[in-house]
């Protein structure tokens, strides 16, 4: 049976985003800032916010509170973040890669498990984002998102592993495609379909 556009969106658009984010530390910083700007914001608003950030940097009206803390962290650490993530791609595979990328992106100030998972998804097509929409529609316990960054390394590793397991049960591509379909249905005046929602992940980022 021929697959619909929305069912192949991940395989068409995600590699474009991966290539962009992996190309340089500066591109990775843009990617992470897109993720951070999406926190408690409708996806349709993120593109304008990212453009504003690119124009005004730390002075952007959308970069405030914890989001400004994330930007400050990135300015100091994005080189090592990019190097570590690229090394993980070259040395790890499968679940080991998922866990390693989560450990890397969870270091970013302001990111919890869901947004770190979103970073993994955008950077490498791995893990995925279990946000509030996915919690509700998939009946996943909110405890899967709980992580205390001040907890012991062992405790944090267990929480990361539990999150990765929750994502792997659904597959990264499935989480992406069905989330895009859901957003398109929730905001039919903003989106043509799920494929459109998927496409703008790349369009927001591309120069």
For each feature predicted by the language model, list its residue ranges.
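Structure-specific DNA junction-binding interface
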Residues: 1-69
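C-terminal accessory module of base-excision DNA glycosylases/AP lyases that mediates lesion recognition
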Residues: 1-20, 26, 68, 83-86, ...
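Short alpha-helix boundary/capping elements
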Residues: 37-45, 79, 127, 142, ...
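Alpha-helical ds-nucleic-acid-binding substructure associated with the helix-hairpin-helix region
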Residues: 41-109
């Amino acid at each position: 049976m021929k697959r619909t556009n929305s069912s192949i969106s991940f395989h068409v658009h995600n590699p474009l985003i991966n290539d962009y984010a992996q190309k340089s530390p500066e591109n990775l910083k843009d990617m992470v800032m897109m993720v951070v700007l999406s926190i408690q914001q409708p996806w349709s608003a993120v593109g304008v916010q990212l453009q504003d950030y690119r124009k005004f940097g730390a002075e952007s009206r959308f970069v405030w509170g914890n989001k400004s803390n994330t930007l400050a962290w990135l300015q100091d650490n994005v080189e090592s973040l990019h190097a570590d993530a690229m090394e993980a791609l070259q040395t790890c595979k499968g679940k080991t890669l998922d866990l390693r990328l989560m450990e890397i992106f969870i270091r970013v100030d302001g990111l919890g498990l869901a947004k770190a998972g979103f970073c993994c998804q955008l950077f490498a097509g791995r893990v995925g984002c279990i946000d509030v929409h996915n919690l509700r529609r998939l009946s996943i316990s909110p405890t899967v998102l709980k992580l205390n960054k001040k907890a012991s390394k062992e405790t944090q590793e267990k929480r990361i592993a539990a999150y990765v397991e929750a994502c792997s049960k659904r597959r990264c591509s499935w989480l992406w495609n069905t989330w895009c379909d859901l957003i398109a249905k929730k905001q039919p005046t903003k989106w043509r379909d799920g494929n459109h929602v998927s496409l703008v992940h790349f369009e927001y980022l591309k120069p």
